[in-house]
Amino acid sequence: MENRWQVMVVWQVDXMKIRTWNSLVKHHMYVSKKAKGWYYRHHYETKHPKTSSEVHIPVGXAXLVIVTYWGLTTGEQPWHLGHXVSIEWRQGKYKTQVDPEMADKLIHCYYFNCFTASAIRQAVLGRPVLPRCXYPAGHXQVGTLQYLAXTAXVGVKKRRPPLPSVTKLTEDRWNERQKTQGHRGNPIMNGP
C-alpha cells in the first residue's frame, strides 16, 4: 500500500501567538463565559503527535476547528520553530479549509454582540444604544456610513482581555502578502 498524502493549508505562526491564543480561548471559556459551547482539546487528548491543541467552535449545525501544531519543519528564522495553525470547517463528513478572516466572521456572527439595524436608528433618535460590537475583528470590510456614525456616537471601548481572533493568531511577518514598493522606492525603475 502506498503512502497517501493530504495537503492542508497551515499558517506558520510564532509560538508566543499560540500561547496567547490558547490563554484567551481558555479565559473566555471558563472566566468570562462568552465562548459557550467551545471545546478545548489538549495535546495529550489527540492522536496526532504534532498537534499541540485543538479548539472546536460550534457554528450552527457545523463546527469550526482551529488546530495548532508544533514540531513541523523549521522555518527560515530561528523563532519560527515549526509552529503552525490550520482552520477547518466541519459539517458531518464534509471538511474544508477556511481562511482566518472568514473564521473571524463566522465566530463574530454566532457568539459576540454586534450593532444591529435598530441600534443606528436609536442613536439617530437620541435613545441609548445598548448593543456594541464586542468583536471588531469580525468586520474585515470598511463600515457603512451609518455604522461609522453609530460607532462615533456610542464610542469604542477596549476590552481587556481581548476576544480571541483567528486573524490576529495567523498574522505575522511571514504570512503577510508581499507589498510592492511605489515608483519612488523601486531602484530599477528610477535608475541608479
From Swiss-Prot:
Pfam families under this entry?
Vif
Q: Where is the motif named BC-box-like motif mapped on this chain?
A: 144-153
Could you identify this protein by its name? Virion infectivity factor
What is this protein's gene name? Answer: vif
Please give the Gene Ontology molecular function terms for this protein: metal ion binding; RNA binding
Q: Tell me the residues on which Phosphoserine occurs.
A: 165
Other facts noted in the record for this chain: Vif-defective viruses show catastrophic failure in reverse transcription due to APOBEC-induced mutations that initiate a DNA base repair pathway and compromise the structural integrity of the ssDNA. In the absence of Vif, the virion is morphologically abnormal. HIV-1 lineages are divided in three main groups, M (for Major), O (for Outlier), and N (for New, or Non-M, Non-O). The vast majority of strains found worldwide belong to the group M. Group O seems to be endemic to and largely confined to Cameroon and neighboring countries in West Central Africa, where these viruses represent a small minority of HIV-1 strains. The group N is represented by a limited number of isolates from Cameroonian persons. The group M is further subdivided in 9 clades or subtypes (A to D, F to H, J and K).
| Induction (UniProt) | Expressed late during infection in a Rev-dependent manner.
